[in-house]
């Protein structure tokens, strides 16, 4: 690790170039998770129903690794040369080679955001546990943000994994002490849980989902209980302002469900930046 730190300090251009490339590669994989995980969960749910009803529907194997990447329109396998992060999308001008249908801008956008996030983390931390942890946390938050926007779901497979990883990283006090991390996880979950039930009791409506509780618990495990007030404040204010402006411009129904996960993720990024500056 000391050698890698020395390399980063002696050859910053090479180091940040490598981080940028790593960000593009990881971003490409994050797109796979964003696309496939909701489908995997739906298939699992359908299989559970089939087991209860006794109606079996043979299903092909489907996970993050299989089948190989294919065109979302015609299902033709994507060649390796057309699967290079960002550059393939730009080279093909946002269209698939096989059927010339448009490919969502989400794919290059996620890759670019991941690259920029990795570069920003590299500015805050030298190579070490804190940097690797920051890259993992930022990657999870980006995936959760996009999935929540698209499906209004924050899968347990991601939120609970993120929570346990936060505790593991803080076993050695990478970001905060283990005591602060454990208290942060409990406080994060209970604070939104209490808010949920208080609002439901007062209005009869549900303002949050259980996935939000688990995501805030995970952020508490990474950043400690001290970060939670500012984190929630940033999430609430950014969510309120942007949502009011967005719905006002689009004249959307105010009763339409709102994904709160992305705003918690923004609060988590804010908390991570403050941790990086030791504020």
UniProtKB/Swiss-Prot annotation:
Instruction: Tell where it localizes.
Output: Cell inner membrane
Q: How does it sit in the membrane?
A: Multi-pass membrane protein
Q: Which residues lie on this side of the membrane: Periplasmic?
A: 1-16, 124-130, 183-185, 234-236, 277-279
Where is the major localization of this protein? membrane
From what superkingdom does this record's organism come? Bacteria
* UniProt-listed InterPro entries: Peptidase_A24A_bac, Prepilin_IV_endopep_pep, Prepilin_pept_A24_N, Prepilin_peptidase/N-MTase
Which residue intervals are topologically Cytoplasmic?
36-104, 150-163, 205-214, 255-257
Task: List the GO cellular component terms.
Answer: plasma membrane
Report which reactions are catalysed by this protein.
Typically cleaves a -Gly-|-Phe- bond to release an N-terminal, basic peptide of 5-8 residues from type IV prepilin, and then N-methylates the new N-terminal amino group, the methyl donor being S-adenosyl-L-methionine
List the Pfam families hit by this protein, alphabetically.
Answer: A24_N_bact, Peptidase_A24
Q: Which Gene3D superfamilies match?
A: 1.20.120.1220
Q: What GO molecular function annotations does the UniProt record carry, in alphabetical order? A: aspartic-type endopeptidase activity; methyltransferase activity
Transmembrane stretches in the record are: 17-35, 105-123, 131-149, 164-182, 186-204, 215-233, 237-254, 258-276
Q: Which UniProt keywords apply?
A: Cell inner membrane, Cell membrane, Hydrolase, Membrane, Methyltransferase, Multifunctional enzyme, Protease, S-adenosyl-L-methionine, Transferase, Transmembrane, Transmembrane helix
Query: Which terms under GO biological process does the entry name?
Result: methylation; signal peptide processing
What EC number(s) does the entry state? 3.4.23.43, 2.1.1.-
| Coiled coil location | none
Q: What does this protein do?
A: Plays a role in type II pseudopili formation by proteolytically removing the leader sequence from substrate proteins and subsequently monomethylating the alpha-amino group of the newly exposed N-terminal phenylalanine. Substrates include proteins required for biogenesis of the type II general secretory apparatus.
Q: Which family does it belong to?
A: Belongs to the peptidase A24 family.
Q: What is this protein's record name?
A: Prepilin leader peptidase/N-methyltransferase
Species, as recorded = Pectobacterium carotovorum subsp. carotovorum
């Amino acid at each position: 690790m000391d050698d890698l730190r020395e390399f980063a300090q002696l050859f910053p251009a090479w180091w940040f170039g490598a981080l940028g490339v790593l960000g593009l590669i990881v971003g490409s994989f994050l797109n796979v998770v964003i696309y496939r995980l909701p489908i995997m969960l739906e298939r699992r749910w359908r299989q559970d129903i089939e087991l209860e009803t006794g109606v079996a529907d043979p299903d092909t194997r489907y996970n993050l690794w299989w089948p190989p990447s294919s065109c979302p329109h015609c299902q033709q396998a994507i060649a390796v040369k057309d699967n290079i992060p960002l550059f393939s999308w730009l080279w093909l001008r946002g269209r698939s080679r096989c059927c010339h249908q448009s490919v969502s801008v989400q794919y290059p956008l996620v890759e670019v955001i991941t690259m920029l996030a990795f570069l920003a983390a590299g500015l805050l931390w030298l190579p070490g546990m804190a940097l690797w942890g920051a890259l993992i946390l930022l990657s999870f938050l980006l995936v959760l943000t996009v999935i929540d926007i698209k499906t209004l779901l924050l899968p347990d497979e991601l939120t609970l994994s993120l929570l346990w990883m936060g505790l593991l990283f803080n076993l050695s006090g990478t970001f905060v002490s283990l005591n602060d991390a454990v208290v942060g996880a409990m406080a994060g979950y209970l604070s939104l849980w209490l808010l949920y039930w208080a609002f439901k009791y007062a209005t009869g409506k549900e303002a949050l989902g259980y996935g939000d509780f688990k995501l805030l618990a995970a952020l508490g495990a990474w950043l400690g209980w001290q970060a939670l007030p500012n984190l929630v404040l940033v999430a609430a204010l950014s969510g309120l302002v942007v949502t009011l402006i967005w719905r006002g411009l689009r004249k959307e129904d105010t009763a339409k469900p709102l994904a709160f996960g992305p705003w918690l993720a923004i609060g988590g990024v804010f908390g991570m930046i403050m941790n990086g500056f030791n504020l």
